[in-house]
């Protein structure tokens, strides 16, 4: 391709096909003009892959470095360096954690996009040398009644859930936690965030880099095909759902190949045969080879003829950037090759030696005895970085006075509404107990009568009762109104979800989903989100160990800002984990912490179409106090549930479901309007159940609301607010989501 003599118009056409800007194409033209030759198609495609938004974070890197750099603590092993974060678990083990988005593929082909998102996040953990032990997914869908898009919303919902189910279940890795959220702002543009936790002995962690010159590069696992070509490019621009080429950019997943690949990789690692490793995700070989060599300050030579193909007619550039799944790139000393072959043959894993690392700065690639690529790795890897401008949106919305004339009806509507109702129709499709290490499941309580858990707890090491708690979610409607406040509340909720299990909050992983970064208001939301994450992480001395940014999530308009927060915690003894359901009748119920009172961005305000945009940041110093109360008194706590979606009324009702134990509470000591105290979702509040003998202790720590009993009664002073049977509410709660699946 004659880039050197291209006109500006022709450069723009080429750039558009590769998701590169005019200025980026000028940089490429300038470079090749200086070296007095045109790029090969392999070189041009590789540059486009490396410089894509998806791969190099060119719109976010400046702000990520400014606000989120070095948020570590004494437990951090690796953070923001390799394919996943690594955190100390105990003296002998570490855990590995990562979350990624797979949004654009899931919008085009929901089943395949979601399935390969799961497969990819598992390999991100695997390539660090860890055994994957748990999956997490947070899903954001449009209005399930919407049929106006390229694909109906129900088709997207069912495709995504089925893809996650089939891939995870067939691999035998439990799906233990996550969230599901619905809003018309995601119509035709779902957000699919998949997370994974792995466990490894601390001396078995593998880095995503080549360690020394002369090491061979081995490609193993699935064969390379035309699926997933230009995947990173189409994920780096606004999605055109009418473009048929997008379907070719969606990878094809095969868990039957990945399952033995996991066993083989772990065995090779146990034998000490792997010196560096990376999974092949976005960008394929182009990304994996380039990043491993550059991280090791080495160059190398690759022979594309050695790559095992699904289609022998593939062109060299297609081989180089294909994103075919279930592939791993391993570096090793050449003397280890016979042992490596024995292990891979035992697991029936295909492999080939495709090249080696060398003491030079360039990467050379050959195909059919012809050099098709010869570039310095520094040119490919030192990608453009933009300091995108941002501005605060004008406050176009004003709150309007509101009074609810039928609280009883509102509570009934709320409990069956799509963002409060039971997630069991989805959760039950996932195997959350395979491997036998899930202690607190996503549903808790009596069989067929369960309620939601706030966080899952897993026991990852056989000879230890220590465990990991994990939760994931976001508050998109509030993020739209107040990006800093919405991100802060997302972090507060995650923190509460961890501490109510009895665990110690440990690490944060973010997956930041936003619209077009060229929109200054979108960038404002993004920057405010980063500030909130920084402030919260520093305040609570946590560690931010891994993250992901997904831009260009847009169809008709940008999606709502969706900073998904995955948080982990460490629990000393999983046998003492606290769950959400009420345990006994005639126990006492207390409110610990405080309800913010704002109805901005709540399920209730959406349900009632309330114009409410007034929000003030919750007091995170109060959250410190809540943490200390739970930590110092967890042996006395029978049940605990955070106040979040649906407010305190939803929290209390959900606690009643697990064992059919009701409550009689009086909200008179919560000093705000009835609508606000019932339905505000923000703040530091947690509802706990304690035995009668602990009354004196907790009278000094929180607000006594009432006691557990047979049915449900809510008072506000002398006024009856709500009265119902548990069974009636459970039927409503159970029926909200099932009709869409």
From Swiss-Prot:
Mg(2+) 2 binds at residues 124, 279. SUPFAM superfamilies: PurM C-terminal domain-like, PurM N-terminal domain-like. One of its GO terms (cellular component) is cytoplasm. Mg(2+) 1 binds at residues 100, 548. The active site is at residues 54, 102. Its EC number is 6.3.5.3. Substrate binds at residues 101-104, 123, 251, 323-325, 550. It catalyses: N(2)-formyl-N(1)-(5-phospho-beta-D-ribosyl)glycinamide + L-glutamine + ATP + H2O = 2-formamido-N(1)-(5-O-phospho-beta-D-ribosyl)acetamidine + L-glutamate + ADP + phosphate + H(+). GO terms for biological process: 'de novo' IMP biosynthetic process. It is an enzyme of class 6 (ligase). Keywords: ATP-binding, Cytoplasm, Ligase, Magnesium, Metal-binding, Nucleotide-binding, Purine biosynthesis. One of its GO terms (molecular function) is magnesium ion binding. Pathway: Purine metabolism; IMP biosynthesis via de novo pathway; 5-amino-1-(5-phospho-D-ribosyl)imidazole from N(2)-formyl-N(1)-(5-phospho-D-ribosyl)glycinamide: step 1/2. It comes from the Archaea. ATP binds at residues 57, 98, 510, 547. It is found in: Cytoplasm. Part of the phosphoribosylformylglycinamidine synthase complex involved in the purines biosynthetic pathway. Catalyzes the ATP-dependent conversion of formylglycinamide ribonucleotide (FGAR) and glutamine to yield formylglycinamidine ribonucleotide (FGAM) and glutamate. The FGAM synthase complex is composed of three subunits. PurQ produces an ammonia molecule by converting glutamine to glutamate. PurL transfers the ammonia molecule to FGAR to form FGAM in an ATP-dependent manner. HAMAP family: PurL_2. Belongs to the FGAMS family. Monomer. Part of the FGAM synthase complex composed of 1 PurL, 1 PurQ and 2 PurS subunits. This is Phosphoribosylformylglycinamidine synthase subunit PurL. It comes from Picrophilus torridus (strain ATCC 700027 / DSM 9790 / JCM 10055 / NBRC 100828 / KAW 2/3).
């Amino acid at each position: 391709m004659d880039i050197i003599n291209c006109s500006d118009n022709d450069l723009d056409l080429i750039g558009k096909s590769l998701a590169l800007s005019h200025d980026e194409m000028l940089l490429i033209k300038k470079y090749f003009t200086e070296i007095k030759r045109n790029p090969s198609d392999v070189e041009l495609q590789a540059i486009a892959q490396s410089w894509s938004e998806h791969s190099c974070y060119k719109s976010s890197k400046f702000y990520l470095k400014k606000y989120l750099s070095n948020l570590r603590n004494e437990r951090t092993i690796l953070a923001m360096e390799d394919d996943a974060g690594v955190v100390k678990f105990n003296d002998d083990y570490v855990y590995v954690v990562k979350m990624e988005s797979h949004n654009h593929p899931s919008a085009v082909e929901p089943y395949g996009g979601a399935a390969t998102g799961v497969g990819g996040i598992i390999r991100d953990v695997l390539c660090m040398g860890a055994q994957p032990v748990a999956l997490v997914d947070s899903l954001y869908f449009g209005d399930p009644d919407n049929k106006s898009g390229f694909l109906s919303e129900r088709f997207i919902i069912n495709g995504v859930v089925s893809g996650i189910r089939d891939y995870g279940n067939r691999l035998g890795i439990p799906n233990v936690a996550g969230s599901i959220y619905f809003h018309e702002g995601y119509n035709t543009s779902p957000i699919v965030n998949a997370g994974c936790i792995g466990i490894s002995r601390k001396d078995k962690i593998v880095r995503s880099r080549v360690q020394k010159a002369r090491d061979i590069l081995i490609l193993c696992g699935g064969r390379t095909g035309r699926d997933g070509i230009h995947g990173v490019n189409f994920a780096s621009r606004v999605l055109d759902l009418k473009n048929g080429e997008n379907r070719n950019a969606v990878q094809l997943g095969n868990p039957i190949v990945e399952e033995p690949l996991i066993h083989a990789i772990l065995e090779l690692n146990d034998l000490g045969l792997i010196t560096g490793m990376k999974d092949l995700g976005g960008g394929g070989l182009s990304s994996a080879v380039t990043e491993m060599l550059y991280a090791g300050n080495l160059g190398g030579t690759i022979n594309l003829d050695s790559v095992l193909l699904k289609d022998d007619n593939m062109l060299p550039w297609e081989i180089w950037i294909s994103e075919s799944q279930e592939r791993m790139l391993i570096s090793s000393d050449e003397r280890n090759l016979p042992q490596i072959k024995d292990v891979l043959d035992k697991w029936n894993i295909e492999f080939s030696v495709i090249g080696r690392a060398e003491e030079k700065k360039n990467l050379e690639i050959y195909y059919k005895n012809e050099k098709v690529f010869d570039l310095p790795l520094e040119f490919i890897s030192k990608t453009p970085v933009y300091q995108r401008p941002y501005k605060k949106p004008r406050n176009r919305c004003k709150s309007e006075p509101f009074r609810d004339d039928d609280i009883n009806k509102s509570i009934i509507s709320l409990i069956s509404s799509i963002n409060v109702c039971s997630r069991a129709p989805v959760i039950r499709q996932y195997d959350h107990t395979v491997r036998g290490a899930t202690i607190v499941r996503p549903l808790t309580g009596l069989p067929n009568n369960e309620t939601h858990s706030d966080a899952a707890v897993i026991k990852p090491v056989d000879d230890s009762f220590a465990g990991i708690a994990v939760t994931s979610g976001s508050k998109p409607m509030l993020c739209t109104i107040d990006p800093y406040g919405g991100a802060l509340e997302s972090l507060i909720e995650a923190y509460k979800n961890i501490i109510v299990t009895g665990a110690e909050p440990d690490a944060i992983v973010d997956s930041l989903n936003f619209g077009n970064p060229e929109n200054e208001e979108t960038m404002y939301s993004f920057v405010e989100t980063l500030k909130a994450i920084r402030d919260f992480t520093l305040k609570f001395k946590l560690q931010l160990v891994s993250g992901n940014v997904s831009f260009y999530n847009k169809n008709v308009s940008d999606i709502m800002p969706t900073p998904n927060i995955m948080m982990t915690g460490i629990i000393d003894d999983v046998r003492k984990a606290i769950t959400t359901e009420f345990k006994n009748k005639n126990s006492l119920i207390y409110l610990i912490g405080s309800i913010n009172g704002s109805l901005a961005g709540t399920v209730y305000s959406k349900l009632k179409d309330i114009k409410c945009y007034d929000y003030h940041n919750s007091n995170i110093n109060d959250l410190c106090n809540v943490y200390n109360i739970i930590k110092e008194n967890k042996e006395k706590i029978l049940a605990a549930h955070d106040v979040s979606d649906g407010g305190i009324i939803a929290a209390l009702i959900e606690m009643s479901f697990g064992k059919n134990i009701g409550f009689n509470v009086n909200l008179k000591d919560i000093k705000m309007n009835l609508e606000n105290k019932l339905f505000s979702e923000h703040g530091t509040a947690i509802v706990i159940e304690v035995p009668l003998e602990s009354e004196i202790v907790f009278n000094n720590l929180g607000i006594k609301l009432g006691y557990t009993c047979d049915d449900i009664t809510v008072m506000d002073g002398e006024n009856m607010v709500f009265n119902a049977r548990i069974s009636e509410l459970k039927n409503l709660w159970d029926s909200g989501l099932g009709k869409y699946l």
